[in-house]
Amino acid sequence: MVLAVSLYVNKMTSKVSLTNDQLKDLGLYLIEPARELGEFKLIDSFNNEFVPDDFKGRWNALFFGFTFCPDICPITMGMLSRIEKELGLVAENKIKVFLVSVDPDRDTPEQLKIYLENFNDKFIGLTGGIDQIYNFATRVNAPFSPVINSEDPNYTVDHYGSIVVINPEGKYAGFFRTPHEQEKIRLGLLELINKQL
């Protein structure tokens, strides 16, 4: 395992692209050709309208979850925060991390902002109408089971665990499958940074 990671690190520093099989070993599955996202309008955690074109110009890592999630969401956001800090200037303006809410009834822009500040103040939350979110999630193969008008205030939402990748052209480019391993995702993101736009 250590040898394999070392080989990946050597390839990264020499800017040699990894093969698709090597990317899959890192848990990164790229889709070729990348797919259009379609149209949607969401609201970000700063109360600004967010549309597909807002993904353009950088790589984007999206996790579909919710702020009341008891396990995989905080674990994943914490891991992505550590990765972002490890990458430092290498990733500056080249990768943006998003939490896309699958629970818009509870996840207001303000709630998302407060939640994400616990992990990384560079992260952006996205929320909006359940139909808009569901259609977007379907486009990027991130299924979830919407909960509408639940009488239980402590309800949970079943959702996808992988990390969706959107390329600098604003297209669905692939995903990091579960289970997540921090070092592998870091190396996969480095490979994306090294790719030509």
Where are these regions (language model features)?
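N-terminal targeting signals for export/organelle localization
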Residues: M1-E39, Q196
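Short loop/turn microsegments at loop-to-beta-strand junctions
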Residues: L37-G38, N60, Y160-S162
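Short active-site neighborhood of thiol/selenol oxidoreductases, capturing the structured segment around
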Residues: F50-T76, L80
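Conserved helix-turn-beta segment immediately C-terminal to the redox Cys motif
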Residues: R58-W59, T76-L99
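Thiol-based oxidoreductase modules, predominantly thioredoxin-like and allied folds used
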Residues: K94-D107, K122-D131
